[in-house]
Every structure is written in C-alpha cells, then in structure tokens.
Amino acid sequence: MTRASVLTGLGSCLPSRCVTNAELERTMDTSDEWIRARTGIAQRYVAEEGTLTSDLAVGAAERALKSARLTPDEIDAVIVATTTPDRPCPATAPTVAARLGTGPVPAFDVSAVCSGFLYGLATGSGLIASGAAERVLVIGAETFSRILNPQDRSTSVIFGDGAGAVVLRAGEPGETGALGPLRLGSDGTGVDLITVPAGGPPRPGAAAPDDLADRYFTMEGKRVFWLAVQRMGECAESVLDRAGWRVADVDWLVSHQANHRITARLADEIGIPRERSVSNIAEVGNTAAASIPLALDHAHARGTLRPGDRVLLTAFGGGLTWGAAALTWPAVDPV
C-alpha cells in the first residue's frame, strides 16, 4: 500500500529586527505609499549581524518538533530549502541537524529559490513513500537581506528574512493532514530572470570589484509576474485534477508570498475568491523558500486554517522553477 505523508507539526522563526517602510524611506528613494501600492508590504524582518540561516532554521524546527510532540532523535531526515546557505559548501542542513540533536540522519539542502519549500516537501514525501524514513523535517529558511543591493528599491523593499518548518510522518492516503498530489516543473531558459549573476566559475565573486552590481540578487519583475501567474496557475489546475477537487472545493489558496498583485491575479486565474487566499506578505514581505511554511504557520496561529480544510499550495521561483500541491489541513498543536 502507498504510504502517504501527513503534516503533523509546524513552526516558524523571524529575526528580532523589524524594518518598516518608513525606515526604508530614510535610506533610499522610495516611500511607504510606493511600496504598499506595488507589493502590499508594510514591513519585513532582517537578520542582525551574526545571525545565520541555520539559526533561523533551528528556531523554526524546534517549534515544529514541539508542535508535533516529537524529540529530535525521532526524526529520520532533515531537509533545508534555501538560497542563502551559511556558506557555499557544505550544505546548511547538517549544521541544523547537529544543533537540533537528531543524530547521524540524512541531512541535505534543496535549492529552488522561492519554490524551494515545495521541492523539499516533495523530496521528504518521497523518502516516506519509499520507506526510507518515517518522519522528515522540512525547513524553508532564508537570510535574503545578505544578497540584496541596499540601493535597489526594486528588490530591497520586497524581501525579508525568516524560516518556517513542518514535520511529515508516514500515514494513510486520505487521512486528515495527508499531502495529496504534488507537481513540480522547471525551465532553465529563464535562468537569468531571477539570479545572482556573479559568484560561480563564469564570474567569480572574489574577482568582482566592490561596486559590481552583479554580486547582488536581480529580477526582471514584469516578465516574472506573468510567468509566475501562468506557471502556478497551470500547476494548480493539474494538481486539482489529480486530486479530484473542483475549484469550489478549495477552502484556502496558500501561494508563495511574492507580492500582493501576483497572489491576487493568481487567485483570479484559478477562480478562487481573493478572500480565500492566505496572505501575510504585509507583515513579513517575500521570504523566498520560507514564505509558504511561514504563511501556513501564521494562518494556523490565527485560526484561519481548520482541520479538514482543503488547501492548495503554489510556488514560483528562480531557475525557473514552480510547483503546486494539495493538502488536507490536519489538527496541529499551536506553539
């Protein structure tokens, strides 16, 4: 019999420093009105000097384990989805696993930018389906502020730092909390649309002058907008079809929190009322791979998500990459 993956715990972690739009007004050519109108963001959290991606990942993981009523030594694998690891090599996940105290279990990173959490979810679910693991910790964690050009208002006003985590356990298909159909995709011809151009062998970061903008994250916003809506919409329709759900059956849409215009347009394209689209972008900004688990945890804490609710997850990120998944919301302990 096919083993399902059931969401049994979740948690999140944000840095202590909150940066409002008013603060950004004092450091760059922008305004609160401009930022809100184009992104829907009012504030974002930024990691203090010395705070690493692994620090946020551990904080979110500890809360997820508490929510699942598990101890670290009961976890069989740790997956960290991130674009901003502690260092280029090795992966951040082994550091997270060691700090949690999981023991010598498999621990590795997944890099798919803003789609990373869904890629991690698919990988964790695959470990459970194959029998290689009974319980998997999947974390999305970012310190995106470290790769942003502080003078580029097209990116610096959008992104924030943070982490979200879920615990998956082996279960039965169809039980409350079970992860349903999941679809992923990519298109490498769009690699330059969302990227940090310098840092790899073709353009080593160490050889770049201090003022080289290519050291920072760049994005072609207008092209990304339409591609994100198109790809997430197509993926969502495929997942709904495979799950046997009608659009009217979906209680909540939880999409990657890119900006409020993308999430609103996506809801319209799928046919889900905008008021059924979960959003926390005003409070935390775009947190890349952390955005979906952060949105889930915050919606759960507010009482928005209730056991048995049918939830549709969608994401789009650099690569280009995208994904969607169906999930029946579980009875999860709040933390």
UniProtKB/Swiss-Prot annotation:
<comment type="subunit">
    <text>Homodimer.</text>
</comment>
<protein>
    <recommendedName>
        <fullName>Beta-ketoacyl-[acyl-carrier-protein] synthase III 3</fullName>
        <ecNumber>2.3.1.180</ecNumber>
    </recommendedName>
</protein>
<dbReference type="GO" id="GO:0006633">
    <property type="term" value="P:fatty acid biosynthetic process"/>
</dbReference>
<dbReference type="InterPro" id="IPR013747">
    <property type="entry name" value="ACP_syn_III_C"/>
</dbReference>
<comment type="similarity">
    <text>Belongs to the thiolase-like superfamily. FabH family.</text>
</comment>
<dbReference type="InterPro" id="IPR013751">
    <property type="entry name" value="ACP_syn_III_N"/>
</dbReference>
<keyword id="KW-0511">Multifunctional enzyme</keyword>
<dbReference type="GO" id="GO:0005737">
    <property type="term" value="C:cytoplasm"/>
</dbReference>
<comment type="function">
    <text>Catalyzes the condensation reaction of fatty acid synthesis by the addition to an acyl acceptor of two carbons from malonyl-ACP. Catalyzes the first condensation reaction which initiates fatty acid synthesis and may therefore play a role in governing the total rate of fatty acid production. Possesses both acetoacetyl-ACP synthase and acetyl transacylase activities. Its substrate specificity determines the biosynthesis of branched-chain and/or straight-chain of fatty acids.</text>
</comment>
<keyword id="KW-0012">Acyltransferase</keyword>
<keyword id="KW-0275">Fatty acid biosynthesis</keyword>
<dbReference type="InterPro" id="IPR016039">
    <property type="entry name" value="Thiolase-like"/>
</dbReference>
<feature type="active site">
    <location>
        <position position="256"/>
    </location>
</feature>
<dbReference type="Pfam" id="PF08545">
    <property type="entry name" value="ACP_syn_III"/>
</dbReference>
<feature type="active site">
    <location>
        <position position="286"/>
    </location>
</feature>
<feature type="region of interest" description="ACP-binding">
    <location>
        <begin position="257"/>
        <end position="261"/>
    </location>
</feature>
<dbReference type="GO" id="GO:0044550">
    <property type="term" value="P:secondary metabolite biosynthetic process"/>
</dbReference>
<keyword id="KW-0444">Lipid biosynthesis</keyword>
<dbReference type="GO" id="GO:0004315">
    <property type="term" value="F:3-oxoacyl-[acyl-carrier-protein] synthase activity"/>
</dbReference>
<dbReference type="GO" id="GO:0033818">
    <property type="term" value="F:beta-ketoacyl-acyl-carrier-protein synthase III activity"/>
</dbReference>
<dbReference type="Pfam" id="PF08541">
    <property type="entry name" value="ACP_syn_III_C"/>
</dbReference>
<keyword id="KW-0443">Lipid metabolism</keyword>
<keyword id="KW-0963">Cytoplasm</keyword>
<keyword id="KW-0276">Fatty acid metabolism</keyword>
<keyword id="KW-0808">Transferase</keyword>
<feature type="active site">
    <location>
        <position position="114"/>
    </location>
</feature>
<comment type="pathway">
    <text>Lipid metabolism; fatty acid biosynthesis.</text>
</comment>
<dbReference type="InterPro" id="IPR004655">
    <property type="entry name" value="FabH"/>
</dbReference>
